[in-house]
From Swiss-Prot:
Major place of residence: membrane
Gene: lepA
Catalytic reaction list: GTP + H2O = GDP + phosphate + H(+)
Topology class, membrane: Peripheral membrane protein
Protein name in the entry: Elongation factor 4
């Protein structure tokens, strides 16, 4: 046990986590040179295309240190994006230490800070590493000062390396072995194993990634899931050397994978404790806090025949992604589908892309909304995650919207632009601190505004230098209204949106104009209106297509022309009574972009 080191790598997006892990695998000989690929741990196609890490991956390597001992390194590569911070906290729960990788050119960013604090709260040993020292722009001294100033850990003897060229990576490993403590635990106590992650394999059923805290897990043992009391047989277990390798047992302190032929997706929830059926442990390990979705959107299959497949796909995906929430929903305009909860817009995009790719589905997404707290006139408090569930205006005593606390780190020269953006998003400044050339800003901004497009706009006003970390703070009373869209007098539930009273006329007008461009012309007039309650705030009309019925009258009497026009008018009127309007898919997506281009 004293030779085991469990650690994970935390860093901001693009500071070189995945490249560093490639180097570590190479030095320890986890893969032969032929199998080595760049970013070997980003196994999903989507991860490679976008160049981001989405899922945490684990690897077990043997490293022969300079003191002659051979150490077993279990390391977990974690995502750096704000939407996936829960993946990071899960990975950290399985470790005793963390490598804090900071780009020697860019310096400390918001995500570095957030993940580092998470690690410190869990009492992990944080080892700072300055990466990318081969870059001409690298300034390791300045960055070391920044780490001390902003994060508050001693960084002057931090390891300097370049993951791309491989310089200094052996020093990183030596420092790891020296500074990170070995796991604590009793190999003879009853088995306790924490499920860090699980995913669905078409051949094996549910595969779980586990960290053995106490005791030993052997192949063929009867294993009990503590929350459900179900007993399973440990069919296969082993480690990743990125490849799956079978073992006969996992010892105390190790991280490995386990297959017990669980076919039911809910069989082994993430954060649960496994123990031996014969000699069970008294209590479960502390798990993870459940992450609450921040953004909700309706997902509907384009053809209703796909509904069953869609449901299965969501089930399998939610096993692999513990923070995905879903419940059935039906809409008059779109048929049957699911209301899904996500951690942020990137998470929503990724899930939608994974569903379309891995499970071959075509989906329509409605506009994302956040959760509102509504106090009705009968003093009852309800939570509303979709505009169509909002009670009528006269039944609402008070509507409270979620406020997010946003921590931003940015270079001084962009301060003005960023503050302007925050004010436009109805933000309230709570703190501002200067660290050298960087400014740390704290704002309280309504979650709805953060979720919409705040991140993109923040990046563009600061030329990509600002970084953001946000978390839910509280609910606050606010003057929010629901804007409905009526087409020929009928409400279309999927197009409703909840917005602030001050922006409502503007958003309504913009939405109506967008719809006018997208709805194809029909044989009769289509009236598109935006309304708050019964009060219409905007209207536009898609003009009808009409035939020129007077073309065949050369001269002729005026009463003849009148008769033909009258006849056409009556026909159009009849058409309008029976006609219905088909809404194209683009119309639903238009809501997502309201308020993006205009401003």
């Amino acid at each position: 046990m004293k030779n085991i080191r469990n650690f994970s790598i935390i860093a901001h997006i693009d500071h070189g986590k995945s490249t560093l892990s490639d180097r570590i695998i190479q030095i320890c000989g986890g893969l032969s040179d032929r199998e080595m690929a760049a970013q070997v741990l980003d196994s999903m196609d989507l991860e490679r295309e976008r160049g981001i890490t989405i899922k945490a991956q684990s690897v077990t390597l043997d490293y022969k240190a300079s003191d002659g001992e051979t150490y077993q390194l279990n390391f977990i590569d974690t995502p750096g994006h704000v939407d996936f911070s829960y993946e990071v906290s899960r990975s950290l729960a399985a470790c005793e230490g963390a490598l804090l990788v900071v780009d020697a050119g860019q310096g400390v960013e918001a995500q570095t800070l957030a993940n580092c604090y998470t690690a410190m709260e869990m009492d992990l040993e944080v080892v700072p590493v300055l990466n990318k020292i081969d870059l001409p722009a690298a300034d390791p001294e300045r960055v070391a000062d920044e780490i001390e100033d902003i994060v508050g850990i001693d960084a002057h003897d931090a390891v300097r390396c370049s993951a791309k060229t491989g310089v200094g990576v052996p020093d990183v490993l030596e420092r790891l072995v020296r500074d990170i403590p070995p796991p604590e635990g009793d190999p003879d106590a009853p088995l306790q194993a924490l499920i860090i992650d699980s995913w669905f394999d078409n051949y094996l059923g549910v595969v779980s990634l586990v960290r053995i805290k106490n005791g030993t897990m052997r192949k063929g043992d009867k294993i009990k899931v503590m929350s459900t009391g179900q007993v399973y047989n440990a069919d296969r277990l082993g480690i990743f050397t990125p490849k799956q390798v079978d073992r006969t047992e996992l010892k105390c302190g190790e991280v490995g994978w386990l297959v017990c032929a669980i076919k039911d997706i809910l069989g082994a929830p993430v954060g649960d404790t496994l123990t031996a059926a014969r000699n069970p442990a008294d209590k479960a390990l502390p798990g993870f806090k459940k992450v609450k979705p921040q953004v909700y959107a309706g997902l509907f299959p384009v053809s209703s025949d796909d509904y069953e497949n869609f449901r299965d796909a969501l089930g399998k995906l939610s096993l692999n992604d513990a923070s995905l929430f879903y419940e059935p929903e039906s809409s008059t305009a779109l048929g049957f589908g699911f209301r899904c909860g996500f951690l942020g817009l990137l998470h929503m995009e990724i899930i939608q892309e994974r569903l379309e790719r891995e499970y071959d589905l075509d989906l329509i997404t409605t506009a994302p909304t956040v959760v509102y707290e509504v106090e009705t006139t009968s003093k009852e408090v309800i939570y509303v995650d979709s505009p169509s569930k909002l009670p009528p205006l006269n039944n609402i005593q008070e509507l409270r919207e979620p406020i997010a606390e946003c921590h931003m780190l940015l270079p001084q020269e962009f301060l003005g632009n960023v503050i302007t953006l925050c004010i436009e998003k109805r933000g309230v400044q709570t703190n501002m601190v200067y660290h050298g050339k960087q400014v740390a800003l704290t704002y309280e901004i309504p979650m709805a505004e953060v979720v919409l497009d705040f991140f993109d706009r923040l990046k563009s006003t600061s030329r990509g230098y600002a970084s953001l970390d946000y978390n839910f703070k509280r609910f606050q009373a606010s003057n929010m209204v629901r804007v409905d869209v009526l087409i020929n007098g009928e409400r279309v539930d999927a197009l409703a949106l909840i917005t602030h009273n001050d922006n409502a006329p503007y958003r309504g007008r913009e939405l109506v104009e967008k719809m006018k461009e997208l709805i194809p012309r029909q044989q009769f007039d289509i009236a598109i209106q935006a309304a708050i309650g019964n009060h219409i705030i905007a209207r536009s009309t898609v003009k009808q297509l009409r035939k020129n019925v007077l073309a065949k009258c050369y001269g002729g009497d005026v009463s003849r022309k009148k008769k033909l026009l009258q006849k056409q008018k009556e026909g159009k009127k009849r058409m309008k009574q029976v006609g219905n309007v088909e809404l194209p898919q683009e119309a639903f997506l238009a809501i997502l972009h309201v308020g993006k281009d205009g401003k």
